[in-house]
Every structure is written in structure tokens, then in C-alpha cells.
């Protein structure tokens, strides 16, 4: 392995271009049969989905239904909605994964590490014995849950307490 670089071998084929033509998150939004749909929440403004290449079980990607590429393009309504949705998603993840913390953030642009242009927010559950995100990216930890199973568990919890902007 080259010094100073991290490899995520599961994601290698995706990064090398072995992916469907077009925006993969727009394809998820449109329920294309060409992509895996791991969504756990959908509404008129946002979709929350389990990351197909998670750093940890419960790693979510939250993205606007509109194809945006920069956080500064959000409307005021989208910003308010996203804040309430994040709060609700933290509750789902707390119940499903019992993390001790979270990494939350955006990678905007290829130089920042974004492999998908469509704006998306990462919500990554974290645990006490981890030494950091670098260990996850370097592949030194084993994920103990398939993303499909994570999506199933989160959907079941979401069905018990559906998202409502007024209930957050």
C-alpha cells in the first residue's frame, strides 16, 4: 500500500467508473432498477439512505431530491427541513446502532473527496474503541453488518415513529 494513501477496496470498482451512467443519487430518487435503493426515508425534499460503501454500520447519506452540488444552493425551507430530518435520523440511529458519537459532514467537489457530484450529507455512527476515521478508510476494521440489513432495521424503526417536521 502506498504511504499516505487509504484504500477502500469495496468502492474501487465504483471509483474506477464501473457505475451506471448519470447521477446515481438522482437514479435512487427516481427508483431506477439499475441502482440499489437503500433509502430509509423519502419525502418531497430529501432522501436518507444507508451508504452502499459504509465506514460503519448505520452510515447514512442524506441528499436533496433536487440535484444540487453546493450547500449554498439550499433554500431556507430545505435548510429548516434538513435540520429537523437530521434530528429525527439521529434518533433512528441511536435506537438501531447505539453509537457513542457521530461524524457528520459534506464533501463538496472532487478535491474534497466527493465521488458523487449530487450534494449529500454523511451521518456516520462512531464507537469507543475506534481510533479514527482513518482506520475505517484504510480497511483495518471489519464491518459487522451488511448495508441491506442496516436499511431493513432502520426502516422498521422509522415505521414506528414516522418523520414529521412538526414533531421534531
Give the ranges of each region predicted by the language model.
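HIT superfamily nucleotide-processing domains
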Residues: 1-168
Amino acid at each position: 500500500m502506498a504511504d499516505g494513501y487509504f484504500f477502500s477496496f469495496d468502492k474501487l470498482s465504483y471509483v474506477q467508473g464501473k457505475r451506471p451512467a448519470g447521477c446515481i443519487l438522482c437514479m435512487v430518487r427516481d427508483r431506477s432498477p439499475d441502482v440499489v435503493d437503500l433509502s430509509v426515508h423519502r419525502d418531497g425534499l430529501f432522501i436518507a439512505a444507508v451508504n452502499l460503501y459504509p465506514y460503519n454500520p448505520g452510515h447514512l447519506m442524506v441528499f436533496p431530491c433536487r440535484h444540487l452540488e453546493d450547500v449554498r444552493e439550499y433554500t431556507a425551507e430545505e435548510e429548516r427541513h434538513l435540520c429537523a430530518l437530521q434530528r429525527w435520523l439521529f434518533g433512528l440511529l441511536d435506537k438501531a446502532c447505539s453509537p457513542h458519537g457521530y461524524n457528520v459532514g459534506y464533501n463538496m467537489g472532487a478535491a474534497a473527496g466527493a465521488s458523487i457530484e449530487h450534494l449529500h450529507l454523511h451521518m456516520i455512527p462512531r464507537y469507543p474503541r475506534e481510533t479514527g476515521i482513518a482506520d475505517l478508510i484504510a480497511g483495518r476494521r471489519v464491518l459487522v453488518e451488511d448495508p441491506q440489513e442496516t436499511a431493513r432495521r432502520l426502516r422498521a424503526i422509522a415505521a414506528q415513529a414516522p418523520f414529521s417536521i412538526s414533531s421534531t
